[in-house]
């Protein structure tokens, strides 16, 4: 495997190449390139890119997943979007798009946090109610839910011991579920929003069967992941008798890592697409606003300095 890490020096080289080409009569600015601009050259400049579903078209109502802001020094800041569309970018400068991205990112955090809180709170109440009911029956020795209408006196000693054992195990399980849910809810309640920070990115090339040509190119970077503990019940009214047999009917998901590595695979460039007064160019799943006469973008070649290959 042949690997080259994208370093600050490599980014500087890409920027220098861009300036050199511009001085030779071609403009290689991200927005106004007069010659096709390679991925490393484009990302090596200050620029704002839009990530969207690679299977979708660039259109006014198309949803935006993320906005990526490159600082020209080998770093990118990723902002998640909450229902933003390509139409929302119309008439905005890059700085205004970044401000919108910051607002959107916080909205994503707030929405996911609130959804987790709203789902987990009734789950805690329901589990607590079942636990309290079964605990009272266990402590008092009535075992009403477990008897399901039968008389306690009808049980053999062996049956009674088995019923006690079931209660004990179920109560232990419920207590563990309650503690996990309460701890998760407390962590979610105390979570505060932190604005995304610039992170280094790497580029990776996959070659074709000859090993000489680029088949695809991938950009990888760390990005915030807003994931919170969440408990969900199939039915908020859990029957204690059923819980003794089947357990709590529902599920829970643990909070994920605050930072997650993301990758976007780039294939052949897409044709320029116009939305209102904007012209977009880039790749399936990743585009930026350019001038109408922009020459487009291209994948890097396997011999490009600073890029991992295969």
Residue positions per predicted region:
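Short amphipathic alpha-helical "recognition" segments used for binding
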Residues: 6-7, 24, 116-118
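C-terminal motif of bacterial Sec signal peptides marking the signal peptidase cleavage site
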Residues: 18-23
């Amino acid at each position: 495997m042949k690997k080259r890490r994208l370093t600050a020096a490599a980014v500087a080289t890409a920027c220098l190449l861009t300036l050199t080409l511009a001085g030779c009569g071609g403009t290689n600015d991200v927005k106004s390139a007069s010659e096709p601009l390679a991925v490393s050259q484009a990302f090596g400049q200050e620029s704002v890119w839009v990530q969207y579903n690679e299977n979708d078209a660039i259109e006014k109502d198309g949803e935006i997943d993320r906005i990526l802001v490159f600082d020209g020094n080998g770093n990118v800041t990723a902002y998640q979007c909450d229902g933003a569309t390509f139409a929302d970018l119309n008439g905005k400068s890059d700085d205004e798009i970044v401000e919108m991205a910051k607002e959107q990112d916080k909205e994503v955090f707030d929405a996911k946090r609130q959804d987790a809180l709203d789902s987990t709170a009734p789950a805690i109440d329901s589990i607590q109610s079942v636990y309290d009911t079964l605990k009272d029956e266990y402590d008092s020795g009535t075992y009403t839910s477990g008897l399901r209408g039968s008389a306690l006196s009808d049980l053999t000693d062996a049956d009674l011991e088995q019923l006690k054992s079931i209660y004990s195990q179920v109560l232990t399980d419920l207590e563990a579920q309650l503690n996990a849910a309460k701890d998760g809810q407390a962590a979610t309640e105390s979570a505060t929003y932190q604005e995304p920070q610039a992170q280094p990115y790497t580029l990776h090339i996959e070659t074709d069967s000859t090993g000489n040509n680029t088949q695809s190119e991938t950009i990888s970077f760390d990005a915030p992941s807003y994931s919170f503990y969440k408990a969900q019940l199939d039915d908020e009214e859990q029957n204690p008798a059923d819980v003794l047999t089947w357990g709590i009917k529902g599920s829970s998901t643990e909070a994920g890592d605050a930072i997650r590595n993301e990758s976007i695979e780039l294939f052949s460039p897409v044709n320029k697409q116009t939305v209102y007064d904007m012209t977009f160019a880039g790749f399936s799943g990743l585009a930026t606003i350019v001038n109408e006469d922009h020459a487009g973008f291209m994948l890097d070649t396997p011999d490009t300095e600073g890029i991992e290959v295969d």
